[in-house]
Amino acid sequence: MNSSSDGANEGAGAAADNGPTKVAESIAIIIIDILICLGNLVIVVTLYKKSYLLSLSNKFVFSLTFSNLLLSMLVLPFVVVSSILREWIFGVVWCNFSALLYMLISSASMLTLGIIAIDRYYAVLYPMVYPMKITGNRAVLALVYVWLHSLIGCLPPLFGWSTLEFDHFKWMCVAAWHKEAGYTAFWQVWCALLPFIVMMICYGFIFRVARIKARKIHCGTVIIVQEASQKNGRKNSSTSTSSSGSRKNGFSSIVYSANQCKALITILVVIGAFVLTWGPYMIVISTEALKGKNSVSPVLETLATWLSFTSAICHPLIYGLWNKTVRKELLGMCFGNRYRDPFHQQHRTSRMFSISNRITDLGLSPHLTALMARGTESEHQSTTTNTGFSCSNESGTDVMLLDDTSSDATQLHRVIYSRRKSSVTFEDEVEQKNDARTMPTQPTAPSESLESYAFNLAKAIEMDAKISLFGEDVFPSNVQALPGNSGINRNRINFIQKQRVQLQSIEEGNIETSKCDV
């Protein structure tokens, strides 16, 4: 292994850089370090303080942002000092340790992106089996595997396959990519190419399914949005549907195209951020491994390294603030009642559990997982998330909703929307049924109950995807039948009414269903 003294002669030329270049590089790395630290710290604190946000998907996000936070605290400060002084002054031991730490954190971050892509794949394509495939234990095992996988990719330089040294153009200690082309190729494939392939495959399938669903909805339903003013001056969308195979309504084509663009943009942002931040760095180290150390311009080498650091800035933005629930809680923590109260008054706290939310939020809503989990638990304990089931009749068409409310907003939610929808939680319903039950009921086999429960929930999710594949938080308030399609609409409404089920209780595997009151 090489120390800082091994490259003293080489560093003499780098130290002679002109003043403006030195100042620009130093300012840039300082800004990058501050942004990485603040951005990831905000997401880590938000997820930690709001424990109900730590769904399985968000646990992966927490691990990702926490590792980036470590990078900003344990690695980048020394890069800043080296960039200013134009030399490494912290000794050989810390040089080797910081190089190993940088490679470990960077590798773990890239592999975590692949794990998140797999998580999204199951959440979007197989929502019914998601709680069984992605469990808490498996999530922990996945995170442990990520770090062990990364460690395997970073240890070879300590055992003689390549070396660790201070790079005078990257201004940090890192593996000597130009000395061992074999190790450079191994690290790129083991820690970067594998998660990239996983991301391409998973997000490709996600977009394909979203596009197919959008086409089916577009061909079978014409959506007309009518604006109706409310007392507070805001507008509420009312929707009327009719069966039609033609594109007579221009607005439906706009909605169809916009929804596809919405999913496509989300996926492109995820893939594009990975390629743009890590792509140049991979090209630089590959060129060094094949053609030698001086084959790349020092300026390009520095820029590529700095650009790879910016991936840690993108992660909290894409996987944290892009999530509506996390963003809401973050703003609530920053502005308190000035933001939280208007938010609950202007936006519905119940929203459709749709494919749109699963794709664009990039974090699975914990409510379906909690809903499924409650069906198999023998002990009914209240959680931090008040997950309930309700039926809404506000537009003439009953729609199954999964309540998206936290404990501090439950009471306000019931007051505001008591006239529009009825909501009942699992815990309250279980207590009511226990008090009111005077006649013994015939027991139902747990396997049959779970099958019926899964079938009804699958039908509801299927109807949600067909009605509102990329719906907004506020579901349209009116559904009107267009002239000339009354028979078809009547059949559609009758079919929807068959799906109006309300989970009454879950106790010892006994699941009962009944129609919601219209």
Curated annotation (Swiss-Prot):
The chain crosses the membrane at residues 27-47, 60-80, 98-118, 139-159, 186-206, 265-285, 302-322. Residues 1-26, 81-97, 160-185, 286-301 are extracellular. InterPro entries: GPCR_Rhodpsn (IPR000276), GPCR_Rhodpsn_7TM (IPR017452). SUPFAM superfamilies: Family A G protein-coupled receptor-like. Pfam families: 7tm_1 (PF00001). Residues 439-448 have a biased composition (Polar residues). Glycans are attached at residues 2, 96. Keywords: Cell membrane, Cell projection, Cilium, Developmental protein, Disulfide bond, G-protein coupled receptor, Glycoprotein, Membrane, Receptor, Transducer, Transmembrane, Transmembrane helix. One of its GO terms (molecular function) is G protein-coupled receptor activity. The keyword Membrane applies. Disulfide bonds join 95-173. One of its GO terms (cellular component) is ciliary membrane. Belongs to the G-protein coupled receptor 1 family. Key negative regulator of Shh signaling during neural tube development. Recruited to primary cilia and acts as a regulator of the PKA-dependent basal repression machinery in Shh signaling by increasing cAMP levels, leading to promote the PKA-dependent processing of gli3 into gli3r and repress the Shh signaling. In presence of shh, it is removed from primary cilia, preventing its activity and allowing activation of the Shh signaling. This is G-protein coupled receptor 161. It comes from Xenopus tropicalis.
